[in-house]
């Protein structure tokens, strides 16, 4: 049997070497790319190893290395984020209260490995709803509905203290805690509105009474002044006849000024002007 020898293709060894080099280069680039990861600003990273589990080290912002196929980077956002929770509960005097709480929450950066082991990456959804609702119900139940309004700042401080302490037990930091909503049942709201209207009417009535009292005092003072003036005039007339003449002259002057401004001409004698010769 005759076997024909396949002729060598010119350049085949070079092409084969080029292919091998390309494969090796591609694998090298893949390994390099897989062994690097970036941590953006405001984030932190922890690394999970398939053999040893979560490492205790927390990686800051920047580029870091890991073992491809054996290690995986887990990124956490450590910036403060708002979270709002509304709860319906009852006050000490059995009034229905709807209260809303807003918190700025973030994970404690140096506790990320423990957070991942116990809560995972969605730590906020696992912890915050329960501790906020329990705290709101416990604190609101200590106050009457009216005190929740008048002592709102004290209520807010107490809620902030309890929620912050409970969140810290789960390695969660709260940068701000504030009451955003406070509503009551329909009956209590109507009672408050009626009370406010009654208070306004009482203030208005008080003002009217005080004004009437002031007017009364003013009238008395004015009457006393007029009586005193009449008394003094009477004494002046009795003691000095010249005072009567002076009053007549003043009256005549006023009459003359009035007539001077009139368009009609009027002739008056001295008796009409209340002036007579002595």
UniProtKB/Swiss-Prot annotation:
**Where this protein primarily resides, as one coarse class?**
mitochondrion
The protein's location, in the record's own words, is:
Mitochondrion inner membrane
Q: Name one Pfam family in it.
A: Band_7
Under InterPro entries, the record lists: Band_7, Band_7/SPFH_dom_sf, Prohibitin
Give ranges for the Mitochondrial intermembrane compartment.
Answer: 38-278
Q: Provide the coiled-coil residue spans.
A: 186-220
Residues passing through the membrane, by range = 15-37
How does this chain sit within the bilayer?
Single-pass type II membrane protein
Gene3D superfamilies to which the protein is assigned, alphabetical: Band 7 domain
UniProt keywords (A-Z) are:
Coiled coil, Membrane, Mitochondrion, Mitochondrion inner membrane, Signal-anchor, Transmembrane, Transmembrane helix
Q: Which residues lie on this side of the membrane: Mitochondrial matrix?
A: 1-14
Cellular component terms per the entry's GO annotation: mitochondrial inner membrane; mitochondrion; plasmodesma
Q: Tell me how this protein assembles.
A: Component of a prohibitin multimeric complex in mitochondrial membranes.
Q: So what family is this one in? A: Belongs to the prohibitin family.
Could you tell me what this protein does?
Answer: Prohibitin probably acts as a holdase/unfoldase for the stabilization of newly synthesized mitochondrial proteins.
Protein name per UniProt? Prohibitin-7, mitochondrial
The protein's organism comes out as Arabidopsis thaliana (Mouse-ear cress)
């Amino acid at each position: 049997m005759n076997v024909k020898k396949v002729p060598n293709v010119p350049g085949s060894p070079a092409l084969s070497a080029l292919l091998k080099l390309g494969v090796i280069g591609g694998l090298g680039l893949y390994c390099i790319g897989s062994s690097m990861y970036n941590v953006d600003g405001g984030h932190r990273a922890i690394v999970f190893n398939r053999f040893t589990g979560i490492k205790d080290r927390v990686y800051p912002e920047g580029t870091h290395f890991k073992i491809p196929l054996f290690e995986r980077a887990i990124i956490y956002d450590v910036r403060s984020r708002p979270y709002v929770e509304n709860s319906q509960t009852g006050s000490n005097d059995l009034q229905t209260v709807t209260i809303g709480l807003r918190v700025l929450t973030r994970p404690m950066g140096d506790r990320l490995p423990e957070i991942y082991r116990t809560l995972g990456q969605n730590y906020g959804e696992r912890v915050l709803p329960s501790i906020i609702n329990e705290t709101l119900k416990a604190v609101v139940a200590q106050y009457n509905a009216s005190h929740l309004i008048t002592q709102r700042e004290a209520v807010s401080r107490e809620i902030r203290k309890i929620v912050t302490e409970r969140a810290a037990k789960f390695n969660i930091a709260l940068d701000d805690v504030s009451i955003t909503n406070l509503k009551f049942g329909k009956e209590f709201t109507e009672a408050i509105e009626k009370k406010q209207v009654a208070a306004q009417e009482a203030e208005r009535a008080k003002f009217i009474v005080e004004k009437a009292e002031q007017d009364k005092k003013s009238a008395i003072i004015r009457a006393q002044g007029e009586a005193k003036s009449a008394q003094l005039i009477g004494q002046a007339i009795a003691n000095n006849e010249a005072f009567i003449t002076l009053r007549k002259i003043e009256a005549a002057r006023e009459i003359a000024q009035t007539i001077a401004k009139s368009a009609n001409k009027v002739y008056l004698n001295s008796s009409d002007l209340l002036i007579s010769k002595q």
